[in-house]
Amino acid sequence: MRKKLFGQLQRIGKALMLPVAILPAAGLLLAIGTAMQGEALQHYLPFIQNGGVQTVAKLMTGAGGIIFDNLPMIFALGVAIGLAGGDGVAAIAAFVGYIIMNKTMGDFLQVTPKNIGDPASGYASILGIPTLQTGVFGGIIIGALAAWCYNKFYNINLPSYLGFFAGKRFVPIMMATTSFILAFPMALIWPTIQSGLNAFSTGLLDSNTGVAVFLFGFIKRLLIPFGLHHIFHAPFWFEFGSWKNAAGEIIHGDQRIFIEQIREGAHLTAGKFMQGEFPVMMFGLPAAALAIYHTAKPENKKVVAGLMGSAALTSFLTGITEPLEFSFLFVAPLLFFIHAVLDGLSFLTLYLLDLHLGYTFSGGFIDYFLLGILPNKTQWWLVIPVGLVYAVIYYFVFRFLIVKLKYKTPGREDKQSQAATASATELPYAVLEAMGGKANIKHLDACITRLRVEVNDKSKVDVPGLKDLGASGVLEVGNNMQAIFGPKSDQIKHEMQQIMNGQVVENPTTMEDDKDETVVVAEDKSATSELSHIVHAPLTGEVTPLSEVPDQVFSEKMMGDGIAIKPSQGEVRAPFNGKVQMIFPTKHAIGLVSDSGLELLIHIGLDTVKLNGEGFTLHVEEGQEVKQGDLLINFDLDYIRKHAKSDITPIIVTQGNITNLDFKQGEHGNISFGDQLFEAK
């Protein structure tokens, strides 16, 4: 239960990063536009006082500000896409749900344009709708609900007369209904929740702000290895605290308040839960990287210089620290704990110095320059002496403990592992293999710095192999694996997903995707489309076109072309003379290769992987030669119909170079064992 919850929290944390990724662009526009309108920059660059330049500056400020004004809706769309595997239908559903929920709440509570002017009411105008202000939390709730609707109903079947509304078209319909229902409990409960959040945040800040900011920095850093820090900091940045802008609107959240104050040129009061990152990311961690380099063995220093130099520069410029942190987290956990304490102390130090710095992405130099130096609204220069002190502390603490405790940080290993030589194009295949292959992957995801994979059997994961491929660290919690590949993690995930979906079939391999419950038998390049391959019916039943299979992986021919049979008997027989190439462990799918070189996948039913082999009896084994008509598998047809999504059985040619299939008896009608099903050319 705990491991399953951890996996779900990881996915939510990753989903929150999609809307957050938009903020740097918005912050760039807002910061430059605001700075160009400020007296400080105009004093040094008088030409920007030109009317045309000032018009552009105002437009930039407005363009950046509109993103922050609509963060709840952006979070609704981003969370929906993130939790629904990137499908845009979920975003449409989230938008529909968001406006319906707000409109229904507004009408139910009788909110009008007049009473939204009272800040104490908790009302606001959302996309022109007078309604209850639920903030970013409201957007996250709607996004999660839209993702649930998508995952639940994206492949739903309806009667033929309602066929137009089946599948993905049904998702926004369900979302409209569920968000309408959700609006009523939200209207009744949310004011109490918001009051509680306000009271908690006020009490937290008023009781002992110094302790609060220290604990925030300390805990947030400790959560980074688990990927849960996004969930932890979200309420601090987007909900806790309040400030009234010039228009009388109440703004919640440390980051939102900071951005609004920058936009209005107001006195800064926010930034307490962000600014502590700057000394650590710009000075402390790069100094730690230098200590790791200096303590490396002489023969390894050249390699370590490249690794640590890149990680240090990434931390300094962008504030992305995981590649550097994971280089010592597992081999020297004490160093990471000290690092977390120093991070908390950095927050406390800048708070005591009465600084007010913020960022849109992270505590690197880019945000420091755009939102600290350019606006010139706080004593930003104090970060530099604090940072230099931090650099000295980090360097000597890390160097002393690495040598004293003989930590095996990069370059100090007893035997330098042989680095894998996978090229950029080969890397996703190598990572997939190191994760145990497609059959071992239950859920695949990534965030800015780490590949997040939930596996079926972690004993099949080659952790040293992942590190050899460039992962600076691999975290294991239950069956959840996190491989730290830095900023290229998302690209690796995207390419792995393409391989698993059968969209890319280089590097021949056999894989299973539990999400779509499908098997890919990779194309054998030696097979040629110039040959003619006869395929006989492996089952008795009703022939159905692949386009009518209620699973988009098959219906959209992502796996390859073919046909499906709705069986009337529980037997699968060999459709040609050949060999058994692959049998999936749960016995629901079998891959065959004919003597003429045709590769065929027979996938018994849909979602049958979840049956874990129950109801299936094998009569062959991998590598066995078979003759056309030999019994391959018996299956309990009644059991499958009762416990699986469907008994319909796709029969797929998995070679992309074979696209011409001649269905001898058509794509409809009944067929029996041994009848000619199709000819592949």
Curated annotation (Swiss-Prot):
PTS EIIA type-1 domain boundaries: 551-655
Coiled coil spans: none
Biological processes, Gene Ontology terms: D-glucose transmembrane transport; phosphoenolpyruvate-dependent sugar phosphotransferase system
EC top class, as a word: transferase
Entry-linked InterPro entries: Dup_hybrid_motif, Glu_permease_IIB, PTrfase_EIIB_Cys, PTS_EIIA_1_perm, PTS_EIIC, PTS_EIIC_1, PTS_Glucose_EIICBA, PTS_IIB_1
Transmembrane segment boundaries: 16-36, 73-93, 126-146, 170-190, 199-219, 273-293, 303-323, 328-348, 355-375, 383-403
Entry comment, domain topic: The EIIC domain forms the PTS system translocation channel and contains the specific substrate-binding site.
Protein name: PTS system glucose-specific EIICBA component
Lineage per the UniProt record: Bacteria, Bacillati, Bacillota, Bacilli, Bacillales
